[in-house]
UniProtKB/Swiss-Prot annotation:
Cited PANTHER family: INOSITOL 2-DEHYDROGENASE, PTHR43593
Function: Involved in the oxidation of myo-inositol (MI) to 2-keto-myo-inositol (2KMI or 2-inosose).
Keyword Transferase carried by entry: no
Gene Ontology MF, one: nucleotide binding
Top EC class of this enzyme: oxidoreductase
E.C. number(s) listed in UniProt: 1.1.1.18
Name listed for the protein in its UniProt record: Inositol 2-dehydrogenase 2
Source species taxonomy: Bacteria, Bacillati, Actinomycetota, Actinomycetes, Mycobacteriales
HAMAP family: IolG
Length: 342
């Protein structure tokens, strides 16, 4: 395939970053169309990119004959309709999380995609493309720590937008640790419990922050996650896996630290997610572009991964209300080999 022509839908912070990324750092692709519900913003972005134009209707942007593939950086509430349009037009799509905003529509999207001859949807869980997470995954897969037993995670933000509520801490923040757990351990999550510590006095009124999430996988491994999104300090993400023959930690801005081997402590805390995971986003988009041009369409988290994360987070929101462990119920995974393609 020649240069991939990409439509970027939604040019807020994330979408504008993707436009700049594809334009300046990604090979084999260019942005041909942009769309945003704020028309003036889309027109401004388009004017800054050679050969790019703004299209008012997102569905028209997807259907545009000068678009080969789509990046969705629109609000999650719009994803279902836009993803279905991508499937209808057989256009590969990189969809920023969430896949959709509820379990039922996420499952329907996964099922609809499974009816096609090949996958089209990749979900933007960028940590899978982070150098440190990839090293940790390789360490676990290589068996150097023996059987992984427990994982400790920290997810801290300096602050959140004014519309953030307690459930969004689960759906927008914990969702990353949910995918990390499934990625590193290679198994599904069986239950989730959200514990409410004493709330931060600086948190917005009515927002329960911090929260502690306890995940249990189907094999019995436990993961604890500290979620604290109003620290007023910086963006801090840490992950430590404890295995039968040692432990490994990432996220200290000094590379992977092994407690069973000499290591160095120290470093600065990233001020935001763009600084912490900028390279991961670059790798994610480059690998997606390469996959689309090669005809495989995805090289990363699938629509099923998006659905599974939504199911865990739905159980998490239920636990946030009750304080009790809530089982995660997953549907049977669609099998493309047993479904007659559309």
């Amino acid at each position: 395939m020649s240069e991939l022509r990409v439509a970027v839908l939604g040019v807020g912070v994330m979408g504008a970053d993707h436009v700049a990324r594809i334009t300046s750092r990604i090979s084999g692709a260019r942005v041909s169309v942009v769309n945003d519900y704020v028309t003036e913003k889309a027109e401004q972005i388009a004017s800054e990119v050679d050969g790019c134009r703004a299209v008012v209707d997102p569905l028209d942007a997807i259907a545009d004959p000068e678009v080969d593939a789509v990046v969705l950086a629109t609000p999650g509430s719009t994803h279902e309709k836009q993803l279905l349009a991508c499937l209808d037009h057989r256009k590969p799509v990189m969809c920023e999380k969430p896949l959709t905003t509820d379990v039922f529509t996420s499952l329907e999207i996964a099922r609809r995609e499974a009816e096609l001859e090949c996958p089209l949807i990749q979900v933007g869980f960028m940590r899978r493309f982070d150098d440190e997470y990839m090293r940790l995954k390789a360490l676990l897969d290589g068996g150097e720590l023996g059987q992984p037993l427990v994982m400790h995670c920290v997810h801290r933000n300096p602050g959140v937008p004014s519309y953030f509520d307690s459930s969004l801490i689960v759906k927008d923040s914990l969702v990353h640790e949910v995918d990390v757990t499934r990625y590193l351990f290679g198994e599904e999550i069986a239950s989730v419990q959200i514990v409410r510590p004493v709330s931060n006095p600086a948190a917005p009124e009515g927002v329960i922050d911090p929260q502690i999430a306890i995940l249990r996988t189907v094999s019995g491994r436990h993961v604890d996650v500290e979620l604290f999104v109003t620290t007023g300090v910086a963006y801090e993400v840490r992950t430590e896996v404890v295995g039968e023959r040692g432990s490994a930690m990432i996220g200290l801005d000094v590379g992977l630290i092994r407690k069973s081997a000499p290591g160095t402590w120290g470093g600065l805390i990233a001020p935001g997610f763009r600084e912490r995971f900028g390279r991961a986003y670059d790798t994610e988009i480059q690998r997606w572009v390469d996959a689309v041009r090669a005809g495989t369409n995805i090289d990363g988290p699938t629509a099923w991964d998006g659905y599974a994360a939504a199911a865990v987070c739905a159980a998490g929101v239920e636990s946030l209300e009750s304080g009790l462990p809530v089982p995660v119920h997953l549907a049977e995974r669609p099998d493309r080999s047993t479904i007659r393609p559309r």
